[in-house]
Amino acid sequence: MILGLGLDVVEVARIQRILAGPPARAERFLARVFAPSERAYCDARQDRATRYAARFAAKEAAVKALGTPEGVRWLDLVVERGSGAPSLALDGLAADAARRLGVARVHLTLTHDAGVAVAAVILEGTGP
């Protein structure tokens, strides 16, 4: 059963402006929003702003799918990239919210084109 659905669109230029801005501001943003593994993945790519935008969209979509629980931190949501499709790991208050909803599986899809990054998150489970 589908327990939650979240969708988000991020303009890549918005992230590019942050990355190209004052280094201290960019670092604060990256440290507050992205886990070290996400940063390593994005920073190793030529299109790093696009990669960051997709991950930011994934986090926003996940929060929407969870019902916008209070206190969830960006770092409670981590986009992981193995050899296949990306996945979303939940920790902290995000994991607590998922447990309360009865989430058994999190589906994530990312795409980017024409200057935007899009993410969709579907939460699947049996319910509370």
From Swiss-Prot:
Q: Which Gene3D superfamilies match?
A: 4'-phosphopantetheinyl transferase domain (3.90.470.20)
Q: Which cofactor does it need?
A: Mg(2+)
* One annotated GO molecular function: magnesium ion binding
Organism of origin: Anaeromyxobacter sp. (strain K)
Q: Which SUPFAM superfamilies match?
A: 4'-phosphopantetheinyl transferase (SSF56214)
Q: Which GO terms describe its cellular component?
A: cytoplasm
What GO terms in the biological process aspect are recorded for it? fatty acid biosynthetic process
- Which UniProt key words apply to this protein? Cytoplasm, Fatty acid biosynthesis, Fatty acid metabolism, Lipid biosynthesis, Lipid metabolism, Magnesium, Metal-binding, Transferase
Q: Know the name of this protein?
A: Holo-[acyl-carrier-protein] synthase
Q: Which domain of life is it from?
A: Bacteria
Family annotation (Pfam families): ACPS
Keyword Metal-binding recorded: yes
- So where does Mg(2+) get bound? 8, 60
Tell me which EC number(s) this protein carries: 2.7.8.7
HAMAP family tied to this protein:
AcpS
